[in-house]
Amino acid sequence: MFAKSLFFLALFCVSFAGNFTIAQDSYLLNGKPIQLMSAAFHYFRVHPDRWEDTFKKLANAGMNTVETYIAWNMHEPERGQFNFEGANDLDRYLTLAEKYGFLVIVRPGPYICAEWEFGGLPYWLLKEDGIKIRTKDPKYMEPVTQWMNTLLPVLSPHMIMNGGSIIMVQIENEYGSYPACDKEYLTELYDLTVANLGPATQYVTFTTDGPSDGMLTCGRLAGKAYSTVDFGPGNAHNPFATMRKYEPVGPYQNSEFYPGWLDHWKEKHQRTGAEPILKTMTEMYEMNANWNFYVFIGGTNWGFMSGANGGGKSFQPQPTSYDYDAPLSEAGDRTAKYYAIRDKIAEWKTLPQYEVADSEKKSFGEVAFTEMASLWDVLDVLDAQPVAGEHPVTMEKLGLDYGFVLYQTKLAAGGELRVTDVHDRVYVYVNRKYFGLIERQDPTRARWRSRRRRAMC
């Protein structure tokens, strides 16, 4: 009896190689049709102590797949210095996904958008004069190649054909929304992917774009990556009809189905009702379509990592919170929307029931601040050497990733301050007295006149 028990345990712990492929109108997992109900859950936005709890809540809601971006700037904060530990422990994240039976979709970029700082690109790329990001420019592709050749071997043991759960790997990200339209660049990314992970015959490489001809034309990589679309609640037939023009054979896939929406500074928190979500989700289910809730849990943009939307003179920065009005709140709590989605999916299949709880809330009372120091009081104790020059130097050229730079100059007389392009916020002082604020999204406030005879800015 003892020997038989050991034999059973040994079999239970073995992982088996599998495959994930495209059929006429569906995906096949090990040769059998499967419909993906996926949840976007970005490891870098949720504290690692909450990862396991989050996976349980996703499973209880009926998700069979999880999707995550991979934020390059979290893993290589400085050129050649890689970090895959703690909050960046991809191996642990993927192992937990496998523990709870999830298939995994990874979106390694290198550009990810995601309303994350610089779209996940590391700041130090901008030290290189004239670099053309998201193109085949060698100044860009050299560090991209080094990064992909470091990252993808970390993913390799977790690929479906190696006994893991990664079934899909995205090439770039919504590239049809970027004006470069560089197909050679997309091909280079694809080649890096298959060189490290193996031919895309047992897993699927794919692209994601908005459901328009212009976006799909520039964003797709025909014959190499499967073209998918993204859209929110509404008529699912129209965007899928556009997708079908570019992929005559294969399953429908909404790679970003929006159950909420992002916030911007100076705007109200976004809210999306559950009913439109359930209606479109049901429509996709009946079409045998696949979808990925973007996002099922939003989490937090830690530190200086919140991104922005915009283009040209438009600039809409995101706050620290990435709550997104998602089914799981920023704190990981189950919302009314979560229960509505779970209950609808429970009509289609039996759901697991892992024991979970929402986050504990505490009041810390009042905290009295009794001392303070101004910037000018601490300049002498800051561990920084001044850099002199005739013109302001960018933060990247100074080797500063995030935070603040103090620019100072002496003026022989008063005059007019003109700032034409600030990234992203400037506090102006004259003779150490606050003078005004310049914001990237409000350039009309970037001109002042000082009548002081002598001034220090």
PLM regions with names:
Residues F2-L9, C13-T65, T95, G101:
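N-terminal carbohydrate-binding accessory modules
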Residues W51-G119, Y123-L125, Y190-G198, Y203:
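Aromatic-lined substrate-binding rim segments of carbohydrate-active enzymes
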Residues G80-N88, E98-K99, G109-T135, L186-Y190, ...:
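Aromatic- and acidic-residue-enriched segments that line the glycan-binding/catalytic groove
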Residues T95-E98, F102, A195-N196, D230-S329, ...:
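Catalytic-core region of carbohydrate-active enzymes that cleave or remodel glycosidic bonds
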Residues K139-K224:
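Active-site neighborhood of glycoside hydrolase catalytic domains
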Residues G415-R432, C457:
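Aromatic-lined ligand-binding clefts that engage carbohydrates, nucleic acids, or primary amines
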